Amino acid sequence: MKFQVHAQEMERIVLLEAVGRLTLTEGQTKIRDLIHVFTGNGVKKFILNLAQVEFIDSYGVGELARCYSVVRQLGGEIKLAGVSEKVLGVLQICRLHKLFEIYSGEGAALQAFGQRA
């Protein structure tokens, strides 16, 4: 499946839903490109739902780290939601699970931002 990212803004929080394989050949910079669009409009809170991400390689891990860095440099926050055990295992190996706040789903991540699901 070709990698896609769907975005929805809710009360100054952007929900990004990633679908497919987050790899060098498929993921490219789609997440970061959307983050740049929304941060340019003043949004600083993001939830990245990875529930439908089938696979992540080293490029995908690096892309997540770059997204985190971009958002943090602008004084924002990015939380992960719906991370599968397979993807979480990769994040743990790369120690990114210590960088991101990880939630079971979008509702829990929204609550962490103080919003109703």
Give the residues covered by each predicted segment:
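Short beta-strand/loop segment at the start of cytosolic alpha/beta domains
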Residues: M1-E17
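Short, charged, intrinsically disordered terminal tails
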Residues: A108-R116
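Acidic phosphotransfer microenvironment of two-component signaling modules
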Residues: E85, G107-A108
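Short acidic-hydrophobic, aromatic-tinged amphipathic segments that line or gate anion-handling sites
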Residues: E101-G105
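Residues at the C-termini of beta-strands that transition into short coil/loop
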Residues: V19, E106
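Amphipathic alpha-helical interaction surfaces in cytosolic regulatory modules
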Residues: L22-F100
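Conserved catalytic submotifs in the C-terminal HATPase_c
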Residues: M10, A51, G107
